[in-house]
Amino acid sequence: MMPLGLFPLPRAAAVLLISLLTLPAQAAERVISLSPSTTELAYAAGLGDKLVAVSAYSDYPESAKKLEHVASWQGINVERILALKPDLILAWRGGNPQRPLDQLAALGIPIFYSDPTHIDQIASDLDKLAQYSPHPEQAHQAAEQFRQHVNTLRDRYARSQPKRTFLQFGTQPLFTSSGHTLQSEVVSLCGGENIFADSRVPWPQVSREQVMTRKPQVIVVSGTQSQVDNVSAFWLPQLVVPVIALNEDWFNRASPRILLAAQQLCQQMASIPTPVAESH
């Protein structure tokens, strides 16, 4: 007879059990988010009603627009943060300046750092935020739903014919992504092959000639649909390939909404035929 503890739990019961095991002695009551991505993570993890301030451009969900701004590209307003008396700060390790964060940490304020480089780490961040949330079950459920969605996309597009993909950011100068970013992983999820995946730096500056040498079959940009015509014109007449424009906020933020960009990209990538000469 199988021991009781070895019976597999239904998924909902497993999530509830994890929530009970990670329930903090005291959840955070006054939370400050220092990037749009961590603001979205906070809401997804059930911390939205505990936010007292956020960064500039924290515009999702709608209620985030009503919150005070204490950080921007110009820096972090340490004095104002201290006046708000937070018991938790959510920071973006790759984007927020470290010195003011060190000052805040030295004063005893807990800081949660988020800087996913792999798409699965977004779910991990949600699970970790559960310990601070008054609704830990919401954080764990959001993480589980995220993982399920990722697996669904992986299964659906695993057999797609690979397409050499150029991730384009800007034109003058021209930047792209290496294989060590969330954006590159989204491309891989949809059957694309990042032509600069082998770059040693995360966001290399490249030349027009370097791009053409690697012969991309599709170009991916973030922005509105109007970007498509501009990017297509930029490469004429030497390079004529499909251009896919993804919602900028979905694609560039390390939050659950990046899967909306993934779904958008996968659908459009799948509709692009592989050139006959390269399909064998």
Swiss-Prot record:
Q: Name one GO molecular function term.
A: cobalamin binding
Disulfide bonds, paired cysteine numbers: C190-C266
The record ties this protein, via InterPro entries, to: ABC_transptr_periplasmic_BD, ABC_transptr_vit_B12-bd, Vit_B12_bind_prot, Vitamin_B12-ABC_binding
The UniProt record gives the binding positions of cyanocob(III)alamin as Y57
Query: Which UniProt keyword terms apply here?
Result: Disulfide bond, Periplasm, Signal, Transport
- Where, if anywhere, are coiled coils annotated? none
Q: Where is this site: Important for BtuC binding?
A: E79, E209
**What is the protein named?**
Vitamin B12-binding protein
Biological source species: Yersinia pestis
* Encoding gene per record: btuF
